[in-house]
Amino acid sequence: MSGKREFKSFGSTEETMFSQHHKIPSTSEMYAEPENFLEIEVRNPKTHVPNGVDQRGMYTDYEIICRTNLPNFHKRASRVRRRYSDFEFFRKCLLKEISMLNNPRVVVPHLPGKIYLSNRFSDEVIEERRQGLNRWMQIVAGHPLLQSGSKTLIRFIEDDKFVG
């Protein structure tokens, strides 16, 4: 009978297919730096009391650490400190920049809510806000259109003083 074909189990077919068409990556390739990346983290909150003991001038700022190899960023690593009011101003500037670019595909989420309670400087409240700002920053900085085209994002992440 000339119509008979040799039987191959799925396992042997799969093995043949992968060995012929796919190279198994080496350990250094698996753990190498990705082609394009932006890592960002909001951490290390610090509460400042500029008038000594008087709480009226107290504020908390947060450290933003960024590591990237994206070509439109000026620094490969940056570390800045920002207050909540800086995040508010950044969001406002970002919305203005997006409207000028006329790009409806970029939606900037709302910031975590402002805290008006008397315990706003408690460790628990500050940590909750830090986590919220970290999530917010991950979303905003993670947007591919903002990564590749927002000068406002770059200034907020890299400049010591953010002026918009």
Curated annotation (Swiss-Prot):
One term of GO molecular function: phosphatidylinositol-3-phosphate binding
Pfam family, one: PX
GO terms classed as biological process: endocytic recycling; late endosome to Golgi transport; protein transport
Principal subcellular localisation of the protein: cytoplasm
The entry's keywords: Cytoplasm, Golgi apparatus, Lipid-binding, Membrane, Protein transport, Transport
Ranges for region Disordered: 1-26
Domain of life: Eukaryota
Subcellular location: Cytoplasm; Golgi apparatus membrane; Prevacuolar compartment membrane
This protein's GO CC annotations: cytosol; early endosome membrane; Golgi membrane; protein-lipid complex; retromer complex
UniProt binding sites for a 1,2-diacyl-sn-glycero-3-phospho-(1D-myo-inositol-3-phosphate): 83, 85, 114, 120, 129
Recorded topology in the membrane: Peripheral membrane protein
Biased composition (Polar residues): 10-26
Signal peptide limits: none
PX domain span: 40-163
UniProt family annotation: Belongs to the sorting nexin family.
Free-text note regarding domains: The PX domain binds phosphatidylinositol 3-phosphate which is necessary for peripheral membrane localization.
Role summary: Required for retention of late Golgi membrane proteins. Component of the retrieval machinery that functions by direct interaction with the cytosolic tails of certain TGN membrane proteins during the sorting/budding process at the prevacuolar compartment. Binds phosphatidylinositol 3-phosphate (PtdIns(P3)).
Protein's UniProt name: Sorting nexin-3
Gene giving rise to this polypeptide: SNX3
